[in-house]
Structure formats: structure tokens, C-alpha cells
């Protein structure tokens, strides 16, 4: 890792190069000045030059060596002479090392240097705090303090980075990561493999997947229903489709059921042996053979179940990051949202809002779909048709705002059919479809059409 002095020297070089480009190239002057508004300059001379450039720009005055020098004199800035501005202009125009580098690349380099500086400071201060009193202080208290410092470091780093906007054409045309490149990759995936889910995952249900990409990368997805309607069953069914049939990596955080109970549901789903028979043990030799075969099937899958009773939001967020970093999961399921506790404890509504915002941010940060199960309020029971609505989401309207997709399950107890309604879809259409539900195996399937 670089030392602070090395990072600071590099940042001063970038400051110099950016101010030179702002002085010479009028087409990028405004952009550069806008990106440096909240930047903490490492060189006081560069800070004063930036202030002068911004003053000239804000007052519709030309930014030249002469105009900048006159303004510096008016402000009685004594540590800069006119020759420094002249050299800055010359280097921006003719220096072989500086001239070819675009201002956007320099701004990216400055963001990286700022992040390195923040990270170095975080490690240094955390190490010093540990060494101050390593034996007397509770390790849990120390970890909490380090975690708080890390959160502040991350917030500072990304708040500075997010200030910088980009032109529409840059976003469209950027190599590898631009919109055009992504569209071409989607087309290639569809043309070569008939794959319509380059940026996401199919649920495994044709009636849903043909109408939209629900599990798009970065999506925060809510599956909502009243108790005992099939939220967990649907989540497990989709997880099986992704992990076993699509050979992708899945993380499943169960706050309600044990890992063993989840696996029993998976076995029942795969074998068709009812959950009740698995619990009672009233199994035939043929059924035992099917269960062993199912074990061979799940052995080669990458479905990771976490059920260690971690209800605190910060611990769940850390667990999700570890699943992404260590197990490289493609999707996360959480069962369920109302069991999570947040440190924002003014009231339950604010707590749920904090949980929702955090999970939404994690989905975007890790660029994977996060699917969270949620209960509905009792208002849906008071409605004549029992059809769920967005306003039925329990405890907080923030869930409705944060979610990219909200999927409702509606099932009459006497009917084997479930209505699956996409009540919100930020990036596509809303729709409804019907799936068949087998309560014995907790399995959803397409309704067989009779011709």
C-alpha cells in the first residue's frame, strides 16, 4: 500500500493537470470545475487557482492566464506568481505526458487516490486504537467502533465520487461498461444462446419470465403475501430453479426456519415426497432412494443457507457481502424483512424504512438481485376480493418506494391455484399470471393446459 505522502504527491500532480486543462480547453472547463467543487485540495496554490477559475466562470468572465492573475492579485494571494500559470498552460498544451490524458481519466485517478487515502487513514487509526488498550477494552466494543469508522470512510469515499456527473454520450459509448456495449452483449447472448437474461436471472417460470426480467442485476425485489400463503415456498422454488437447474450460485438467509427445515423443503420439492411424510418418517424404500438421489443432485449445486439467528441489519449486511465476496453468489434471498432489527429505533416504521433502504443499496452496490420476503398488513383480509395492493405492505411505505419489483402471492385456501401479481416493476410492465401450488411439497408449477 502506498504511503500518505506518495498518495498526496500524486493527487497534487493530478490537481495541476486538471487545472491546466480547465485553463486551456474551454469545452471541458465547466465540467472539471463542477467535479472539483467538494474536493479537498492537497496543494494550497491549486485551491486558490481553483477558487479564482470558479469565480471567473460563475461571472461569465474568460479564464486566461491574465484574467486569473489579475483576480489573484485582487485577492492578495501571494504564494502564486504569473509564471506558474504560464507553465501550467504550457504543460497542458505541449507536455507529452500530460497532453494525451483526458480530463475524465484524470478525474477517475483522483477518485482512486482519494479512496486510497481514506483507506490508509482508516487502517492507521484502527490499528492505533487497537494498540492503545488491547487487553482491557471489550473486543465487541472495539469492533463496533471500527465498523462505525469504516461506515464513515465508505460514506465519505462514495459521496465524493458520486458528485461527478457524466455526459449522456460518455455513459452510452464507454468501452466495455457503456450502454451500447451492454446492449450488444445482450444481443450476442440472445443470438448465440437464446439467452434473454444477460443482465439477470430467470425465475424458472415461463409465464413470468416471458413478461419481464424480474431478477435483474441490482434489483431489490419484494415477495409479499399474508402468512401461510406461500412466500417461503416460492422463494425456495425460485432458488432451486437458479441453483440446480441453471447452475448458478444462490445465497438464502433464513431468519424464520432452520437450515435443516429449509433443506427438507428442498428435498420435498425435488422428490415429490410430501413434507409431512419426511417429518413422520413413513417412507417407502423407493422414496428413500429418491431422497438419496436428490442428495446427489444438491451435492453439486451452489446453494448456501445461512440460518444462524442474525437479526441485526448490520450483521445481515456483512453476511450478504461475505456471500458475494467468498461464494460469488448471483442472487440473495432473505426470509423475511419484518424479522430484521435496525439500530434506528425511534419507531418500527422508521426501522423498516432503514432496513429497506439498506437492502436496496446493497443490491446496487453488489450488482446482484436481492429478494426479500415481506408480510402484508391485515387490511388485505378486510377487502372483499382479498387482492393485495402496494399499500398493504406492512410497517412502512418506504418499501414501496425502494423496491424495484414487488411481487404479490394471492391464493384461496381451497384452490390449488395461486395468482402471482407483479404490482410494481420499475424497469418493465406490471402483470399477473397463475401458477399451480402443491401444498404437500410446497412446489409451484405451470398450470397444464387441456386442449
UniProtKB/Swiss-Prot annotation:
One of its GO terms (cellular component) is cytosol. Keywords: ATP-binding, DNA replication, DNA-binding, Helicase, Hydrolase, Isomerase, Nucleotide-binding, Plasmid, Primosome. Its EC number is 5.6.2.3. A replicative DNA helicase, it participates in initiation and elongation during DNA replication. Travels ahead of the DNA replisome, separating dsDNA into templates for DNA synthesis. A processive ATP-dependent 5'-3' DNA helicase it has DNA-dependent ATPase activity. The keyword Lipoprotein does not apply. Residues 194-451 form the SF4 helicase domain. This is Probable plasmid replicative DNA helicase.
